[in-house]
């Protein structure tokens, strides 16, 4: 048998023409050689390799986006709450994730702190003071905004004086500088327009443009190396612009919220007189347009969805979607079904818009389907029955409420106060949602913070 196999091999190799074609289909090694010879030269080229890799990456990116979109759609119905104990702090107004386990928060009682979501540990951060202390201590204002720059190397928030802008370096939270000569009233909102420039919106109706220069950063590093106590610079604004004031109610032109469109370098602003303003924001601020909002009561929150090119504005009971390229009569609005309590926070994640209300609810709006996510029918024993078609709604826990003199005099007959969702933010994975706030009535003192995952 061995000699016979050898003779066939010799015969096949001796007849490379027709004999090879006849025997090729019967022997794997002849067939594979034949296939290799037929590969076109272009498939071995660098150009073909790069094109193939590009197509593969596009397919992987498309698949990844589909996966993230599906996760964003399914996640809200799976979220479970874990509350944190914040002691006697009063109302968390602002929050941002620093990393996968730390969230930085600002409160009405002017406290800046970091919470570890794994251990629940609270670490307070020293707030930065003006060059010259103000003559009057302002009560009941606090820290309303916290924002990280695009590279996540700097953090902007309010200072000890709520009219001032404070800048910290990340991840150490070392102080860098204070902008303390701009606004005459509280800072309500902040937006970074690049890695070194931020805009602040104030209750005095002005918007300040601030720059953290390389010189400021270098001097800040040098001071930290030689001084045992925190030291920081004091900077002045590059520009200070007033928003247009409505003739009928000029005293209510307070800048309440900001959101930046990085692609077009445009900054959206919402004022409490019910207007949306659009500014070109690069090295200065140039007004582009102002438009009256369809629902103009309690416009206190704003977010920009880059993928959808729309701004989402919260009001007393509605979320309105504005595309500055479209006429104002094309503005679409959806009702939260929680009239009177107000939309207190709003954010985009994939195609889902998360809405936090004054009644302690989290609602989820699907911008593609143009409807709120609905409850799933649960077949679990003992679960609370839900009606088909009900909006999916997550409700915050009890938090902590101070039974002080105000509560005893005016609210002691009310057993439970919902905690308004003043702030919420997703982590980088989109699977954890930090939610915080406190009681809605301004005279009540309390807090709430929780991780939904």
Swiss-Prot record:
PROSITE patterns: WD_REPEATS_1 (PS00678), WD_REPEATS_2 (PS50082), WD_REPEATS_REGION (PS50294). Pathway: Protein modification; protein ubiquitination. SMART domains: WD40. InterPro entries: Beta-prop_DCAF12 (IPR056151), DCAF12 (IPR051191), WD40/YVTN_repeat-like_dom_sf (IPR015943), WD40_repeat_CS (IPR019775), WD40_repeat_dom_sf (IPR036322), WD40_rpt (IPR001680). Residues 1-38 are annotated as: Required for nuclear location and interaction with MOV10. WD repeats lie at residues 138-178, 182-220, 250-289, 338-375. One of its GO terms (biological process) is regulation of autophagy. It comes from the Eukaryota. One of its GO terms (cellular component) is cytosol. Keywords: Cytoplasm, Cytoskeleton, Nucleus, Phosphoprotein, Repeat, Ubl conjugation pathway, WD repeat. It is found in: Cytoplasm; Cytoplasm, Cytoskeleton, Microtubule organizing center, Centrosome; Nucleus. Residues 1-12 have a biased composition (Basic residues). Disruption phenotype: Knockout mice are born at expected Mendelian ratios and manifest no apparent physical abnormalities. Mutants have testes that produce fewer mature sperms, an altered percentage of CD4(+) T-cells and natural killer (NK) cells as well as increased splenocyte apoptosis after T cell activation. Residues 1-34 are annotated as: Disordered. The modification Phosphoserine is found at residue 15. GO terms for molecular function: ubiquitin-like ligase-substrate adaptor activity. Substrate-recognition component of a DCX (DDB1-CUL4-X-box) E3 ubiquitin-protein ligase complex of the DesCEND (destruction via C-end degrons) pathway, which recognizes a C-degron located at the extreme C terminus of target proteins, leading to their ubiquitination and degradation. The C-degron recognized by the DesCEND pathway is usually a motif of less than ten residues and can be present in full-length proteins, truncated proteins or proteolytically cleaved forms. Component of the DCX(DCAF12) E3 ubiquitin ligase complex, at least composed of CUL4 (CUL4A or CUL4B), DDB1, DCAF12 and RBX1. Belongs to the WD repeat DCAF12 family. This is DDB1- and CUL4-associated factor 12. It comes from Mus musculus (Mouse). The lineage of its organism: Eukaryota, Metazoa, Chordata, Craniata, Vertebrata.
